[in-house]
C-alpha cells in the first residue's frame, strides 16, 4: 500500500503499471526512504535509434517520467535516480540518455543541465 503513494494521481493505472513492470524495454527505477515508502521514480523506455535504415542504429534510454515526492525534495533523490538511470543505460550499452522537458519548466531544465544534460533538439508547434 505504501508504494502506491508513488503512483497516486499519476498517468498509469495499477493494471497498466503491472504490465509495465513486466516489460524489460520499459524499466522503472524507484527510490524509497528508510521506511520503504516510495519517494521518487524514473519511468524509462529503451529505444533503438534512428528509425531510418540509412544510419547506424544505436540504443537510447529515454526517461519518460522522473519524479520526486514534493515533501522529499532537496534530499538529492532526483540526482540519485538520474545517476542510477545513467548506470543502467551503460549496462545496456546505450549511446545516450534522453528526455523531454516542457518549455518554461525552468527548474527541471536547470536540474537536468546540472546533471550534465544538454539540449539536443527543439520541437515547436503551431496550435490550430
Residue ranges and their predicted role:
Residues 2-7:
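Short, small-residue-biased leader/transition segments that mark boundaries at the very start
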Residues 94, 113-122:
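Conserved acetyl-CoA-binding loop of GNAT-fold acetyltransferases
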Residues 98-108, 125-128:
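Conserved beta-strand-loop-alpha-helix junction that forms the acyl-donor binding cleft
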Residues 68, 74-87, 113-115:
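Conserved acetyl-CoA-binding loop-helix of GNAT-fold acetyltransferases
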Residues 56-70, 100, 122-125:
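Conserved acetyl-CoA binding element of GNAT-fold acetyltransferases
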Residues 47-49, 71, 104-106:
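Short coil/turn motifs at secondary-structure junctions
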Residues 8-58, 64, 82, 127:
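Acetyl-CoA-dependent GNAT
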Residues 89-100:
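Conserved GNAT acetyl-CoA-binding A-motif
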Amino acid at each position: 500500500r505504501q508504494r502506491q503513494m508513488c503512483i497516486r494521481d499519476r498517468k498509469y493505472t495499477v493494471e497498466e503499471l503491472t504490465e509495465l513492470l513486466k516489460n524489460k524495454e520499459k524499466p522503472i527505477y524507484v527510490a524509497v526512504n528508510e521506511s520503504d515508502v516510495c519517494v521518487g521514480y524514473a519511468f524509462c523506455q529503451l529505444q533503438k535509434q534512428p528509425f531510418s535504415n540509412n544510419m547506424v542504429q544505436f540504443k537510447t534510454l529515454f526517461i519518460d517520467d522522473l519524479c520526486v515526492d514534493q515533501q522529499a525534495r532537496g534530499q538529492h533523490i532526483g540526482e540519485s535516480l538520474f545517476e542510477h538511470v545513467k548506470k543502467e543505460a551503460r549496462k545496456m550499452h546505450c549511446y545516450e540518455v534522453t528526455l523531454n522537458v516542457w518549455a518554461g519548466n525552468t527548474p527541471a531544465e536547470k536540474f537536468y543541465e546540472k546533471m550534465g544534460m544538454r539540449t539536443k533538439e527543439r520541437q515547436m508547434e503551431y496550435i490550430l
